[in-house]
């Protein structure tokens, strides 16, 4: 056992020494050799020594093979004397000769597009010039009535168009005056009689509908085992352009802003049938009721269409069901029945 340990120790030492030797040898091998140790160093050295001893070859201009010439030494205070220009007899002769004045030549501008010569059309008529003039006279006289008639037609058409425009403008002003309501404030003492007349006209228009003869009802009911929460109902009512008003219920007016006549309304299906907007978060109910009286203001069919679409939209928003006045599922037969009732009370 001890011999084995000794052998392993010796082998390990030999391996360590071999690794160290190989490392030093690798480092020495990777280091760049200096110029003196390189084999080309002696070559350059011999070339330099040979060049110093041998004379340099210079060309006719005094430059060697490398383009280097002899060193020139100049004095610091040497004045630079300008050289006189070389005499040139040709330049002297040119200076003596004076240029002759040249008259300006006017160049006519050429047109961009050359016009082709117009070919005169031959006159094949056998009549004399006097006959031609006599023939042209009646022709011109015959054309004058035609032009006069044409101008008269244009004048009549212009008058007709202006008259039609005046009539259309007058009709538009009358329609605009009928549609627009008087909003100007009174500036005279007769303001109270005017307001009384206006209120009487409105009351008379309200009395024209008479007593309601029929009521169209739609129920929006929660599904079985569920309730409709007031926190969900209130934003839905406002989105559908309902406004809280008379009888503590919500009404749909002619104007989306809540102005004008009431088209239809929404009430609570549970007695007493009212809403409290301040406590809608604590409010819950089984359902709500849409109702519209007949006759109504405006187009009854259009008003019912708006009410039906509002009920369907509310049912989709709060996951409820639309029922008819008898609390039966809304269907095509019920729709036809409601349309018949609307036509009967129109």
UniProtKB/Swiss-Prot annotation:
It is found in: Cell inner membrane. The gene is zipA. Residues 76-103, 121-145 are annotated as: Disordered. Coiled coil: none annotated. It comes from Shewanella sp. (strain MR-4). This is Cell division protein ZipA. Interacts with FtsZ via their C-terminal domains. The chain crosses the membrane at residues 7-27. Residues 1-6 are periplasmic.
